[in-house]
């Protein structure tokens, strides 16, 4: 018979609480006005808790305790019912993945005025590794996220699906805004309420990846999109090749958004020790409607994507279609 006195009981409870706190690590990724909260328990599944406007420390604690948790990067093979971000064929032919957290690295990029957070994952069985990377710009309300995939298996591993990122959007009166069109009719705004089923925006043209559609979307969370009011999430894939954006709406409480390289006819054989880096997905959030998201994307692009983006420059107006050739006809005399 084991007798435990109050002092020993208090010690055991303290050790248990300490081990729980150490194993259930939460990560906060912030820009000046937005925030992404993740749960990254060592040896467990990385989960997204919240993405939206920046909150207080008290709200963060409350969210971490009560939030609905979604896998931060769902993979194929262990009963996940929705669309997955990553699927592979291992060297032995197996299709199963089960990724768990093995580490977290947070770095301050002083010269770039950004922070870099890397969630390190490893498969439970295979020497297969995925890093989920988050770069939060401190001079623009944009978080870029991408993945870095590698392995140490004896033979090449075939990557069959390799999305850059996954974002769960809570179901409700959510509307999607995106651009579509054709030659001489490009950039037409399409707005629609998200319904059950799959919504896919993709491109397979290679060199004309912005003529019929664009790899940028906005989610209006408060009903029909408004220009200056309402909560909006913006997402833009930073990639000039074939892309695919998927929105999977099933019987649960979420719209499952995934974006990345279009894997159709493009499976990749990843060699041992080779690193496959996916293109970044840029995310932003605004409670000032679509224009608020647009302004944040423009600021981020000027500061970090365009050469000399804040420098005024002359623009050549190409107006030959609007002017028409008849206006250029010389007098016959």
Feature map (PLM): residue ranges:
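Bacterial N-terminal signal peptides that target proteins for export
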Residues: 2-11
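Short Pro-Gly-centered flexible turn/kink motifs
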Residues: 97-99, 268-287
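Terminal connector regions
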Residues: 285, 290-304, 308-310
């Amino acid at each position: 018979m084991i007798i435990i006195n109050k002092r020993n009981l208090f010690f055991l409870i303290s050790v248990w609480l300490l081990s729980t706190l150490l194993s259930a690590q939460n990560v906060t990724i912030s820009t000046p006005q937005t925030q992404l909260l993740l749960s990254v328990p060592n040896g467990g599944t990385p989960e997204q808790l919240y993405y939206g406007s920046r909150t207080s420390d008290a709200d963060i604690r409350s969210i971490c305790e009560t939030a609905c948790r979604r896998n931060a990067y769902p993979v194929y093979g262990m009963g996940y019912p929705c669309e997955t971000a990553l699927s592979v064929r291992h060297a032995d032919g197996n299709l199963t993945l089960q990724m768990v957290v093995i580490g977290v690295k947070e770095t301050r990029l002083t010269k770039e005025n950004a922070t870099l957070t890397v969630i390190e994952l490893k498969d439970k069985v295979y020497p297969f590794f995925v890093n989920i990377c988050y770069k939060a710009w401190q001079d623009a309300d944009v978080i870029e996220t991408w993945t870095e995939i590698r392995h140490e298996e004896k033979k090449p591993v075939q990557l069959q699906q390799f999305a850059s990122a996954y974002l769960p959007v809570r179901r409700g009166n959510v509307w999607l805004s995106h651009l579509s069109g054709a030659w001489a009719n490009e950039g037409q705004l399409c707005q629609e309420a998200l319904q059950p089923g799959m919504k896919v925006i993709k491109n397979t043209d290679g060199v004309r990846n912005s003529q019929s559609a664009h790899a940028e979307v906005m989610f209006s969370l408060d009903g029909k999109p408004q220009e200056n009011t309402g909560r909006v999430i913006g997402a833009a894939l930073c990639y000039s090749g074939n892309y695919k954006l998927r929105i999977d709406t099933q019987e649960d409480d979420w719209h499952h958004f995934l974006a990345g390289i279009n894997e159709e006819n493009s499976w990749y054989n990843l060699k041992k020790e080779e690193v496959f880096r996916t293109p970044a997905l840029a995310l932003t959030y605004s409670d000032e409607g679509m224009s608020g998201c647009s302004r944040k994307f423009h600021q981020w692009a000027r500061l970090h994507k365009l050469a000399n983006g804040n420098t005024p420059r002359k623009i050549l107006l190409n107006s030959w279609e609007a002017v028409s050739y008849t206006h250029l006809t010389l007098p016959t005399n």
